[in-house]
Amino acid sequence: MAEGPLEAPFWRKGLLVAGLDEAGRGAWAGPIVVGVVVLPPGEYPFRDSKLLSPRARERLAEKVKEVALAFALGVAEAAEVDRLGVLKATLLAAERALLSLPLAPEALVTDYLPLPTPLPLLSPPKADEKSPTVAAASILAKVHRDRIMAELDRLYPGYGFARHKGYGTPEHQEALLALGPSPVHRKRFAPVAQAPLRFPEAP
């Protein structure tokens, strides 16, 4: 962020800026989680969650909660991803996160997510590398989703959800072929759709 944070022009105008980012868009299983964070103007140690170790993410998630003016999370379940598609489900999770925010932001920054909003919006690619607010949202979303996947690992053992977090790995592919899709797999994703059914279909 050598050129200054992405949200700096909004901060200079005195606007409350909410940063949003998601976790889980490309996973084969589990929800999409969107974090939203409002930070006061300043310099922060937050970086894209994908560049951090799990321990560092957990530590920084607590720091985000300490310094944020407000934060919230929104979730779109796997069944909603199947029904709506990835983009619309991500937008739904973002809407839920914003509705849960205890204050009203005056500008938004997202990581290339085209939110329909009347507010001033910046949504460049790789915003989580240029915006501490988006990076903070990324950290909260990733930590929350990882906890959900650890719980799903207990509910549906054998898939390795706690390790690969629902993403496509050789281990996950082998488990799908051996066990079939679980109720939290995204049936529209080709590797899942091609796996043999073992669980009963939801009504």
UniProtKB/Swiss-Prot annotation:
Keywords: Cytoplasm, Endonuclease, Hydrolase, Manganese, Metal-binding, Nuclease. Its main location: cytoplasm. Its EC number is 3.1.26.4. InterPro entries: RNase_HII, RNase_HII/HIII, RNase_HII/HIII_dom, RNaseH-like_sf, RNaseH_sf. Manganese or magnesium. Binds 1 divalent metal ion per monomer in the absence of substrate. May bind a second metal ion after substrate binding. The keyword Membrane does not apply. One of its GO terms (cellular component) is cytoplasm. Residues 15-201 form the RNase H type-2 domain. Its cofactor is Mn(2+); Mg(2+). It catalyses: Endonucleolytic cleavage to 5'-phosphomonoester. A divalent metal cation binds at D21, E22, D111. The keyword Cytoplasm applies. GO terms for biological process: DNA replication, removal of RNA primer; mismatch repair. SUPFAM superfamilies: Ribonuclease H-like. It is an enzyme of class 3 (hydrolase). It is found in: Cytoplasm. One of its GO terms (molecular function) is RNA-DNA hybrid ribonuclease activity. Pfam families: RNase_HII. It comes from the Bacteria. PANTHER family: RIBONUCLEASE H2 SUBUNIT A, RIBONUCLEASE HII. Endonuclease that specifically degrades the RNA of RNA-DNA hybrids. Belongs to the RNase HII family. This is Ribonuclease HII. The gene is rnhB.
